[in-house]
Amino acid sequence: VEEGHILRLLVRRVTEARVQVAGSTVGHIGRGLVIYIGIEIEDQISDLEWGSKKILGLRIFDDNDGRMNLPVKDDMGILVVSQFTLCGNLKKGYRPSFNKAAQPSQAFALYEKFLEILGISFGGNLETGKFGAKMNIEMKEDGPVTIWLDSHHKSY
């Protein structure tokens, strides 16, 4: 697989997060995960399924012994935010190129499909930003714990 054609997910553990568009809150969660998703040209449904399964299985919440050993639970929340800048590359200089990012119509369809897949298996509070909008995101990170996932380098 050519490097750069990958579903990119940045997962952050939070105690609270909120996303606003033009001053209005469009998504809010308490304890849970903020997921930034970058969709590239060649991404497939199988990448979305892999990403959803991986996110819901990540054991990054503390158990009773204080060890990261538990996945996100249905009494928590997940806030998904589209972020095409995750698809940027800096192979030529300092200005990111986004030529491998999916076009907005393709990315929106796959973003919606990702939310559908995630929602089937997650019974908690699933919130989103607004696709394509300029957003302000506030979060209280827990840890911090940040996990990088990409569908074509699954060994991460």
Predicted feature locations:
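A charged helix-plus-loop insertion that forms the helical arch/lid used to bind
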Residues: 92-106
